[in-house]
Each structure stands twice: as C-alpha cells, then as structure tokens.
C-alpha cells in the first residue's frame, strides 16, 4: 500500500479490501476481520508512518490512536499481502495499454528486472484505462502486488529520477510502442494551430 494513492482507491474491484477512516474503533474492527493489516495516514509520503497492525497485539488500541492522530486524521488500511515478499510490479501504460513492466524486489533482495505483462496485469490495465484516459492521464505507472492494484503513478516521475531502475530500457520499450503508432491518440483538427506567420 502507498499512502496517498487516491487514484488506486477509485478501483475497489481491482485492489485488496480497503478501509479509509479516522475512527479508531473502525480500524480495530478491520484489523480483527483481516488479522494483519498495513496502515498509513492519508496524504503521507510513500513509506512514511506506515504501521503493521496485528489483531493479537495488546497495543492495538494505542496504535490505532497513533495512525489516526486520536481520531482526527483519516488512515488507509489494507490486509497485509503475503505476495509483498516477492516485490512489486510497475506496469507502464500508454492510453490504457500496457507497454512495459518492471519487477521491484524487496529491499536488499536484488536489482529490479524487466518482466512480462501477465493476463491479470492486462485485466487491471483494462479496468483502469477508461477513467485514466477520461481524466487526461495518457501515461501512467500501475503498481501491483500479486493480483492486486495498490498504487497509480500518474506523473511518470519514477522514470525521470537519476538512477531510476532500468529507466533507459523501459523508455526504449515505450518509445518503440509509440513509434509503432499503436497507442498514439489522434490529434483533433485545429488542436495544434500553425505558428504565427505561416498561414
């Protein structure tokens, strides 16, 4: 789970069970149902103030108060996914179509590697495509853990960071798909007016 990934929460059928609430009692009930969950305050930085909550932990009431700031701040809760131990997959999409994928193993478990797009990945891409394109998001990165969508990067910033894993390889794959013309959206007539003095 990535705190602040509000886009991913708009597709409940594609992600794990999720609770967004500032009510400590609701949080405790969610933990009781799912046994072990991951919790983070809404709007927090990725990976910051993330807590793992266990229904058998005697400190659970105190931790629920911490993550909600005593009921004054909403938190996002999702069941802990065992597939997390295998790492996350970032599927890069253009106009809703998957064009490249990178698997990021857990910390200290080896480098990121390119991987194939699975049928489940394509199902998730198809489920998010209409909404993303409708909101003008033509390039995005979908973050998956196992069979679940857990985050959406609508900025593409991950490929622009210095030292981003496999950025050249992924960009080359994306460029190849774009140059092939498969995912280029048609430009409406008049959308790109001629420069002054050329008419």
Protein language model features and the residues they cover:
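Conserved N-proximal alpha/beta basic substrate-recognition cap immediately N-terminal to
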Residues: 1-20, 25-26
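Short, charged, surface-exposed secondary-structure boundary motifs
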Residues: 3-6, 27-30, 47-50, 152
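Glycine- and other small-residue-rich loops at beta-strand/loop junctions that grip anionic moieties
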Residues: 19, 80, 142
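Phosphate-binding site of ATP-dependent enzymes
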Residues: 24-25, 32-38, 42-135
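ATP-dependent carboxylate activation and anion-phosphoryl transfer catalytic cores
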Residues: 116-199
